[in-house]
């Protein structure tokens, strides 16, 4: 562990097109091998497609999708007396946003559409309607936490 304590959080710049920190975080999650301009093109293209299909502000659609994907609980491993228990814990708000974005991008990469722009746009639209693999992942996470509720007293 570092002696100086945790590294300070760096401030996130607002996205130049939509003026939203969420879009900046999404761009950073889509980013692969340092190709930021490509990641921006993918995200902006996906948000434009979402706007064309819904007719509403794409940032609002993205926020609705994230609200449907954000987990409230998760399980963490805790070793007690030689046994490892899956202990349900509440998820901090910043971590829930990060997990939601990670799941959105991860499951959009696994989709079958032709381009990444289409995949990301459709995953965002599905998530905003309460459908899609990323929403299912959240439900599975909540089910795991509910199933291991008996170990909640091991929380730290």
From Swiss-Prot:
Belongs to the universal ribosomal protein uS7 family. This is Small ribosomal subunit protein uS7. Gene3D superfamilies: Ribosomal protein S7 domain (1.10.455.10). GO terms for molecular function: mRNA binding; rRNA binding; structural constituent of ribosome; tRNA binding. Pfam families: Ribosomal_S7. It comes from the Bacteria. PANTHER family: RIBOSOMAL PROTEIN S7. SUPFAM superfamilies: Ribosomal protein S7 (SSF47973). Part of the 30S ribosomal subunit. Contacts proteins S9 and S11. One of the primary rRNA binding proteins, it binds directly to 16S rRNA where it nucleates assembly of the head domain of the 30S subunit. Is located at the subunit interface close to the decoding center, probably blocks exit of the E-site tRNA. One of its GO terms (biological process) is ribosomal small subunit assembly. InterPro entries: Ribosomal_uS7, Ribosomal_uS7_bac/org-type, Ribosomal_uS7_CS, Ribosomal_uS7_dom, Ribosomal_uS7_dom_sf. Keywords: Ribonucleoprotein, Ribosomal protein, RNA-binding, rRNA-binding, tRNA-binding. One of its GO terms (cellular component) is cytosolic small ribosomal subunit. CDD domains: uS7_Bacteria (cd14869).
